[in-house]
Amino acid sequence: MTTFWAESAVINGVVTPSVRITEVDGVITELTSTPVRETDRVLPGLVLPGLANGHSHAFHRALRGRTHGDGGTFWTWREQMYSVAARLTPESYYDLASAVFAEMLLAGYTVVGEFHYLHDASVYGTALDDAVLAAAANAGIRMTLLDTLYLRGGLSAAGGPLPLAPEQQRFSDGSLAGWATRHASLSPARNTRLGAAIHSVRAVDPDLYADFRTLTAGAPVHAHVSEQPAENAQALAAWGRTPVRLLEQLLGPDFTAVHGTHLSEDDIELLGGSASTVCFCPTTERDLADGVGPASGLLAAGAALSLGSDQNAVIDPFEELRGLEMDERLVTGERGRFSPGQLLSAATADGYRSLGWNGGAIAVGALCDLTAVSTSSVRTAGAAADQLWLAATATDVTTVVVNGAVVVDGGRHPLGDVGALLARAIEEVLL
């Protein structure tokens, strides 16, 4: 048992002063408003529920600051990403992912949904999968491994299926049965669990979705959806339906559509009516020039929203939640597209729910995952407590608790100099 004492904490959306949080075996068992005791672990500043990173590709972090020289497009960026994927071994993947997950913790993330499609099972068996699971445990972050089905190279402009290119072979299990066999052999460690993903309608034929749904019943299921207009055009050419309509049988509270940038009104109604989640990744969607998706429209239709760092060009949960609001302001010319509480919910409880965890809330029975933020930095000084997350950055995170254990203390991670770890891991992959 551990007792934490928060100077102030967000409970049920309300900033509450002087809160003692008692946890047993990683679960919050009691909340009381009381003065601090000598035996309490003090959490200064404002304590938020743990922040959820709903969508990540850890190895993409190696490309940060390396893709801007010639502009290019999403599709040319993808070729650079393939080049990194081709160089990874289980050992180098473990080193890189450990450092990336440590960076996420320093930024305040407590759980990550790792959208994992680098398998290469014919060469490594489950070693690449095991490396990611072990990296999360090494860093101390909670993780849902979204084990991804990826069976073909994409679609032509006319909608015809394309075979896997040589650089995509490492992503594929060859068949749904091959994916299911490998998936069943995975052994998640403590604080990790398995989810599943369809990479996209480009990479998996819709004829397989019913069997995939049966194989993954009860697990969180994610898919990239309508990130680029070309995907919509290809799907319409191939099947006469949008990606969301093709995925209709998978929609529901356990399903998350990642990006959802270019959606029709029918798509919005389908996602909202099924109570699906849509995971927006504002910093990546800016970086890759994807566009700005209809987040407020989805929320109004009944969908939940979550947030992710995706390619990890930026790892800052506060920038993602700000981006959800600020990007819509630019598109609509209106402020207040979301309330501060709605933004925090997307970054916490709704993100946890989309990854299959009972967390993202400071409440009895919830996982004891907490993020403490300084209220006195040059960025947060003077900010209203109930809007602090709209002023803070990752740099303002002081303490992070996962499963009742402190994993970031005073802005420091147990692995040491995370910047140096990242530099070494990236050099190992790129040079």
Can you describe what each PLM-predicted range is?
Residues 62-95, 121-125, 152-173, 229-253, ...:
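Active-site gating loops and adjacent loop-to-helix segments of metal-dependent hydrolytic enzymes
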